[in-house]
Amino acid sequence: MALWGGRFTQAADQRFKQFNDSLRFDYRLAEQDIVGSVAWSKALVTVGVLTADEQRQLEEALNVLLEEVRANPQQILQSDAEDIHSWVEGKLIDKVGQLGKKLHTGRSRNDQVATDLKLWCKETVRELLTANRQLQSALVETAQANQDAVMPGYTHLQRAQPVTFAHWCLAYVEMLARDESRLQDTLKRLDVSPLGCGALAGTAYEIDREQLAGWLGFTSATRNSLDSVSDRDHVLELLSDAAIGMVHLSRFAEDLIFFNSGEAGFVELSDRVTSGSSLMPQKKNPDALELIRGKCGRVQGALTGMMMTLKGLPLAYNKDMQEDKEGLFDALDTWLDCLHMAALVLDGIQVKRPRCQDAAQQGYANATELADYLVAKGVPFREAHHIVGEAVVEAIRQGKPLEALPLADLQKFSRVIGDDVYPILSLQSCLDKRAAKGGVSPLQVAQAINDAKARLAL
C-alpha cells in the first residue's frame, strides 16, 4: 500500500519502485514503528482526533501486530509495500478497517522514521554497551590469571621493554572503557524525540510533544522541527563510535595474531576459534582474529559513506537520507559480532609463559634500566643513553645479553658501573621499578585489576 498517489496520473515504473523501496532493510524498524504508532494514537486522543475507544482499538490491533512481528519478522519481506511505515499502516487497516486510516493524522514519515531510527539506535547502544563490558570483563579475568606472565613490550614491532600479559590485557580494557564512555555520551544526545515535528514545519495539532516523548521513553522532545527531521548526527556519531571501537578491536586482533604466530609463540588460540587448511594439514589459522581485523574496513567505509551522503544536503528531508540505514545497521551489527567474538577468543587462550619470558630476556629490553642506573650514579641521561648504546653494540658483538657482559667490559664504557648493576638488569627489577601509576610493576598491575573489577562490578 502506497501512502501517496492522488497527485499522480501514472503508476510508478516497476524499476523505479524497486529502486525507491526500502522495506528490504527498514523492516528492521518494525517494532519501533509500531511502538511509535501506539504513542501517536494516544497523542491524537488528547487533541480530539481519536476517541478513547478508537485509540483502544488501534492500540490493541498494534499490539497484536507487534507480537506477530516478533514471532516472524521475515513475514514483512513477503510484502511489496514501499517501506515499513506503509507495511504497518496496511496491516493495521487490515485489522481495524477505516479506523486505521486515521492514525497518520498530523504525522509525516519524516518525523516517523527519525523517531523509529532513534528508538532502534537507543536499543542497539544498550546491546553494544553490554557486549563491551563483557569483553572488558573477559580481559580483566585474563589479566588476573596472567599477572606473572612476563613478555616483551614492543615499539616499532621491535622488543622495547619487558611488560606482562596482564598489562597488555589492561591496555585494551582502557580502550574499551573509552568506547563505553563514547557510547554513553551518544546515548544522552540520542535521547530526544523528533515525533510531532511533521514533515519539517511541525504538526498543526496542539500535541504535548514532551508528554509524547515521555511515552516513548525519551527524556525530552527536540526543539526545532526543521532540524529534527534533517538530523542524522546520531547516525554519524554511532558510526564514529563504531569506527573507533573497531580500530581498537583490529589492533587487539593484530597483536594476538602476532603473539600466536610461530615466530612469537606467546599464546595458543583455542581450536574453537581457529580453522585449518584444505591443503596443509598442519595449519591452525587465527581466522576469528583475522576476520575481526578485516571487518574493521567495512565499518570505516560506512562512516565515510554517510558523511559524504549528508555533506551537501539542504534542509530539510531529502530522499538521500534513506541511505542512512543500511550502512548503520551493517556497521553496528559488525561491531557487536566482533565484540562477542573477541570475548570468545579470550575464552580458552593459553599463554606460553616460558616462551614469553625467554623473549623478554632477549632484544636488550633492559637497556633502559642500565641508563637509569647510570643516571642514579650522577651521569646525565643523554650521556648515559649514549654509553648504553655503545654497550649494546658490544653485547651484540659478543652475542650476549647485557647482564652477561663481564664487569670489566661494562666498565670500558663507564667507570661508575659496579657489581651492583647486575640485580638492576634482571627482568623482575625492570618490572618492579615501573611503580608509578599506570606502570607495569606487579603492585600497579594488581591495583589496576582491582580498580577495573570494581568499576565492572566483578
Swiss-Prot record:
Family annotation (SUPFAM superfamilies): L-aspartase-like
Originating gene: argH
Q: What superkingdom does the record give?
A: Bacteria
Report if keyword Cytoplasm is assigned.
yes
Which GO cellular component term is one of those annotated?
cytosol
Q: Could you identify this protein by its name?
A: Argininosuccinate lyase
Protein's cellular compartments? Cytoplasm
Q: Known InterPro entries for this protein?
A: Arg_succ_lyase_C, Argininosuccinate_lyase, Fumarase/histidase_N, Fumarate_lyase_CS, Fumarate_lyase_fam, Fumarate_lyase_N, L-Aspartase-like
